[in-house]
Curated annotation (Swiss-Prot):
Family: Belongs to the bacterial ribosomal protein bS16 family.
GO CC terms, sorted: cytoplasm; small ribosomal subunit
HAMAP family named in the record: Ribosomal_bS16
GO biological process: translation
Keyword list, A-Z: Ribonucleoprotein, Ribosomal protein
Keyword presence, Ribonucleoprotein: yes
This protein's name: Small ribosomal subunit protein bS16
Gene that produces this protein: rpsP
GO molecular function (one): structural constituent of ribosome
PANTHER family from the UniProt entry: 30S RIBOSOMAL PROTEIN S16, SMALL RIBOSOMAL SUBUNIT PROTEIN BS16M
InterPro entries: Ribosomal_bS16, Ribosomal_bS16_CS, Ribosomal_bS16_dom_sf
Disulfide bonds: none
Amino acid sequence: MIKLRLKRFGKKREASYRIVAAVSTSRRDGRPLEELGFYNPRTDEVRLDEEGIIRRLQQGAQPTDTVRSILTKQKIFEKINA
């Protein structure tokens, strides 16, 4: 199963995350199938590849709870249903 989840990177105690599509059994920081965005919790900066995320969701990818929350705030699910 394909999951949309966060991949951690950055310095110790200054984490940032990439939103990636990955096989659910792979490691958190393992090689993803595709990088779809960026999230920095310290500054609340979010950059998304909206077309790529919508494509993956339509193919059946399941977002984790945290990624689902980020996508909801960015109104991605509204764009799918429109």
